[in-house]
């Protein structure tokens, strides 16, 4: 009887130790995931939104629903006759077509 009792105490101790190790692993995974989300949020705050000027930072556009916006540039003639380049973050035509097809597919199939 004493052997069964000691064996039971040993199993309970072993189980509590292993579950504590698993909880520590889960806590570490949660912390890593939280840090990753915070870093992504910071990067999202630094990006340039759609339809805003990206002339000086052509690779800093934000992400859209499916794709990252692209910096699209045009040449503008000012009132004084000078040609200058103006850029804005927008969705390229082939990305618009892909988003349209995906949206249409979602309406039909899902």
UniProtKB/Swiss-Prot annotation:
Signal sequence interval, chain numbering: 1-20
Keyword GTP-binding assigned: no
UniProt keywords, alphabetically: Disulfide bond, Knottin, Secreted, Signal, Toxin
GO cellular component: extracellular region
Regions crossing the membrane: none
Paired cysteines (S-S): 47-62, 54-71, 61-89, 73-87
Subcellular location: Secreted
InterPro entries: Spider_toxin_CSTX_knottin (IPR019553), Spider_toxin_CSTX_Knottin_CS (IPR011142)
Propeptide: 21-44
Record-linked PROSITE patterns: SPIDER_CSTX (PS60029)
Gene Ontology MF: a single term: toxin activity
Tissue localization of expression: Expressed by the venom gland.
Family label: Belongs to the neurotoxin 19 (CSTX) family. 03 subfamily.
Domain notes: The presence of a 'disulfide through disulfide knot' structurally defines this protein as a knottin.
Protein name stated in the entry: U1-lycotoxin-Ls1kk
UniProt source species: Lycosa singoriensis (Wolf spider)
Native organism taxonomy: Eukaryota, Metazoa, Ecdysozoa, Arthropoda, Chelicerata
């Amino acid at each position: 009887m004493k052997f069964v009792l000691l064996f039971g105490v040993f199993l309970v101790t072993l189980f509590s130790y292993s579950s504590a190790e698993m909880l520590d692993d889960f806590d570490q995974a949660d912390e890593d995931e939280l840090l990753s989300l915070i870093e992504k949020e910071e990067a999202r705050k630094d990006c340039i939104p759609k339809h805003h000027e990206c002339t000086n930072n052509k690779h800093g556009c934000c992400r859209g629903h499916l794709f990252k916006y692209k910096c699209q540039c045009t040449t503008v003639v000012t009132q004084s006759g000078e040609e200058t380049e103006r850029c804005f973050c927008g969705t390229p035509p082939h990305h618009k077509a892909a988003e349209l097809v995906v949206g249409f597919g979602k309406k039909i199939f899902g």
